[in-house]
Amino acid sequence: MNNIKIFACPSAEKFTQEICDYLNLKIGKISHLKFKNDNNFVQILETVRQSDVYIIQTVEPPVNERIMELLITIDAAKRASAKNI
């Protein structure tokens, strides 16, 4: 389980923490910023190179915004050279 990294999108932080507690893992460090023009910026704050990355997101209203947060987070993990997402 050394190569497993679990990250939370903003609406799923509590749920992700429960998963990490159950698996005895630390939740991954990630920064989600939302600009005034509604653009999102995600930065993964730890190394995920060659790791299996799990991104937890809930799909509660507003659904479109939640899906975009998830897709942008997936893109950030891909750009950080995650092995599997």
Features from the language model and the residues they span:
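PRPP-associated nucleotide enzymes
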Residues: 1-85
